[in-house]
Amino acid sequence: VSIVTKANIMKKTDGDFLQICREVAEEYPEIETDNWFVDIMAANLVNKDIRNQFQVFLLPNLYGDIITDEAAQIQGGVGTAGSANIGRDYALFEAIHGSAPRMVEEGIEGYANPASLMKAAAMMLAHIGYVEKAERLEKALDAADAKLGPKMTGLPGGGTCREFADEVLAAL
């Protein structure tokens, strides 16, 4: 687990966050933790030689929004990334970019890339114990992305939501 802050500058807010993370980490000695400044982590993520060494990030919302969008861009863009918020009693799965109401306002909702919501659905399936079905959906998404990914621009002339969904269904 990599704890990401700017505790060297934001001494109170991020400093407290880092301290609490360290205290909680002591309760779980079997889980390896380290901590990074958000600017260094941003640089690490664009370095293809080291970005794969990171597995789980623990960070405040502001940095989470930035780092997750950066990571999403590396793997295809925010239109392709799912999101999970998992607590003790409840879990919420959604597209990382939200609902994109702008596309409806502009009349281009048919060009929305459904991959992020489908990835969130795969995460949800795994979370509730349907790991095999989640893996099948992930593979179908990869197949659809390999075929249509470059066409999925979110703009007229690009691939449509229906085309992408049809490719996922065909792969399933």
What does each model-found stretch correspond to?
Residues 15-18, 35-39, 61, 115, ...:
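Conserved structured core elements
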Residues 45-148:
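Glycine-rich phosphate/nucleotide-binding loop
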Residues 33, 38-54, 171:
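A glycine- and small/hydrophobic-rich beta-loop-beta segment
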Residues 7-11, 32-35, 56-57, 110-111, ...:
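Hydrophobic alpha-helical scaffolding
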Residues 7-9, 40-46, 122:
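A short beta-alpha structural unit
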